């Protein structure tokens, strides 16, 4: 059997699926918005709209830039899905708050260690 004649079907990318159009074999957006990430893309689509996503992706000239941009678009969409009031800013606030709590906990542990060392030195 001639391997070159075998048609490998891939699912249409999330962008083409959202636009209800046929996804061409050399779709510019398939590497960045594969079918497996459809849910993430839908979140981004609700936030930015497909036409704005296309404009942003076309503005990024290099593959590395497009890769980072697509990742950012998907993350921002998910952030707004999880926190509709604050989006990515809310996630950053939450992480900063968690860091502050961990710092307080770490300082408490350091203080306990200091006290235990002093007790141990007094016993010797």
Curated annotation (Swiss-Prot):
<protein>
    <recommendedName>
        <fullName>LOB domain-containing protein 9</fullName>
    </recommendedName>
</protein>
<feature type="domain" description="LOB">
    <location>
        <begin position="11"/>
        <end position="113"/>
    </location>
</feature>
<comment type="similarity">
    <text>Belongs to the LOB domain-containing protein family.</text>
</comment>
<dbReference type="InterPro" id="IPR004883">
    <property type="entry name" value="LOB"/>
</dbReference>
<dbReference type="Pfam" id="PF03195">
    <property type="entry name" value="LOB"/>
</dbReference>
